[in-house]
Amino acid sequence: MMKNNALKLRGFLIQCAAGIVAGFLNIALSLAAIKLHVPLFMDTLFTVTASCFGWTCGIVAAVSLHTLSFVVHGFMLQNLTFFFCSLTMVVCVRLMLFRKNALNTMEHGGSKPLRLLILAIVLALVISLEGGLFYYALISLTKYNIGNQAVNMLIYTFVTQNVPMLISATLARFPVNLVDKAAAVFGGYGIFALLQKAVTQRKNSDGSKVENSFAFDSGMGGGIENADEYDEI
């Protein structure tokens, strides 16, 4: 009992640490995209990776990203609102990729790209709606006019055609979010798969038995937590 509790605590702490690292990587990638004038957000790729490890890791990654945004950019109200978009990513990744019924499907290579593509489209739709609502609220209450340049250009293109601001803010986000979330989902899951493979090979070399490809050491060394243990939500 005490040994199991110690393993769970160790796994929890390592998931928290990995989530913080993911937050730093997200902010670094986002700043690089701004510096290189890439018309994407590029701030959630490692949130996807972290979410593949577990709920704890994904949520900590989301919190870390927006906390670091306050440090880097100063206090901006949108960091509080768009934090919910990051949480949406965590929820969607866990529910669409790691529920028990989805787990078996993901083990078949042929369906994996399709499931990832569906996840990217769902994320683009939901987060575009969330982002549009937040943008509309911010611009109505605070005259907020900061954001992704490509999105802003599309918003004002729609507005000049007499499309209502809320609809404009939502529609303008979808094409950018679709590309951004597809990159985040495929890139983030790809990094997770590589790390999973490395840990599985290490276990096999140590003579450990890995029961299935998703029975992954979520702490990368401590606190074994199978992916399907998170299904009870």
What is the predicted role of each segment?
Residues 2-72, 77:
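Hydrophobic transmembrane alpha-helices
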Residues 13-20, 59-63, 80-84, 114-122, ...:
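Hydrophobic alpha-helical transmembrane segments
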Residues 31-41, 75-80, 100-231:
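Membrane-embedded alpha-helical hairpins and interfacial helices in multi-pass inner-membrane proteins
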Residues 67-74, 80-94:
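A compact, surface-exposed functional segment
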